[in-house]
Amino acid sequence: MFSKLFTTSCLVAIALTTAQEEVSGKVSSTKRRQYVAAQQPAVPVVAPVGQCPGGPSLPIECDPKRPWPQCPPQSYCYATNSVDIGPYFCCPVWSTYGAAWRPATPFYNYVPPVPANWPDVAKMTANWPAAAVSVPVKARKPTKSDDEEEEVGKMGGISSSINSWVQRQKL
């Protein structure tokens, strides 16, 4: 009895779903659908950039007589053309020296290393940030292992204390 009821309900469910699909197919043809085109990738806006002595400038134009409102800290106003009439762009200070060492971001806390051909005395006395000065490291002395000596001393101390305790017990 249960199997007949189950098969009948399955057949009714299948019949109803196919009937609804036929009705929805007719309705969808009369229903208007809006076409949405695929989104186009936005073209990035490229700011004008000049050429600083050590690389590209910041994309900020500036006035050489008043560079401070436009140019951020650690940069200066520079005529990126061959003549001084302009255009003027802000150049990071890292672009003027150590161009090979210049980091990707202009406001990076980076100090170029001390020149290798300077003598050690000049490296030590130069007004250069301490992070950049590499002092020759002295060879470290090997540490004495006091553990072995202490173990020997402890063993002697332990044996003598045990011996003295045994002597007292004998008395």
Curated annotation (Swiss-Prot):
Residues 158-171 have a biased composition (Polar residues). GO terms for biological process: endoplasmic reticulum unfolded protein response. It comes from the Eukaryota. Residues 139-171 are annotated as: Disordered. InterPro entries: DUF5346. This is Uncharacterized protein D2096.6. It comes from Caenorhabditis elegans.
